[in-house]
């Protein structure tokens, strides 16, 4: 891809430059198993993205120090908007779902990198740590009801595009994600059913150990 233009004198110069959007946005929609579920308000849940971040160069790659080492630093992204959506007329929809009520959280993050499947990139104390995890906690009990690697399961949607893209290319091309979760009551065993919707594609992670990937 062309990365520069040579401008000489007063003559017009044209060309095509490759651009990359290095920010991502996420809409987290949480639905109750039961519409009369007690305590289903935004203030009772902590939703955040925990991961690493680094300075990026003009190509979107991580800047390395004099020794060629990436300087990843821990970072936490919190919602810039959160609200309870209540059905008052019988026709409320959130991301296409007909519901009585839902919690909606909007977040953003920096560029997401494909997660390598090795110990160093999964160790949060390592400078090579390179992950972003969506973590949902019930504040009433302090229990994490969802903790999973975003690059890992969002890249699964890329496999369904039939574009032949590698995981990193898909993560770069897609800049907005909608994740829909069905949240159990605190008295349950905290097996959460998660339906992740990305541009019409649906992934189901059901009754699994969602904190291990």
Question: Whereabouts are the PLM-identified features?
Answer:
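Structural motif
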Residues: 29-40
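Short, low-complexity, Pro/Ser/Thr/Gly-rich segments in the mature regions of secreted, periplasmic
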Residues: 89-90, 197-213
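Beta-strand secondary-structure signal
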Residues: 14-16, 25-29, 46, 133-135
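C-terminal structured domain segments
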Residues: 133-200
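Short, low-hydrophobicity acidic/polar segments
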Residues: 1-24
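Short, structured patches in soluble enzyme cores that scaffold and shape functional sites
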Residues: 21, 30-32, 51
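Generic marker of residues within folded, mature protein domains
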Residues: 7, 18, 37, 124-126, ...
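Tryptophan-paired
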Residues: 40-162
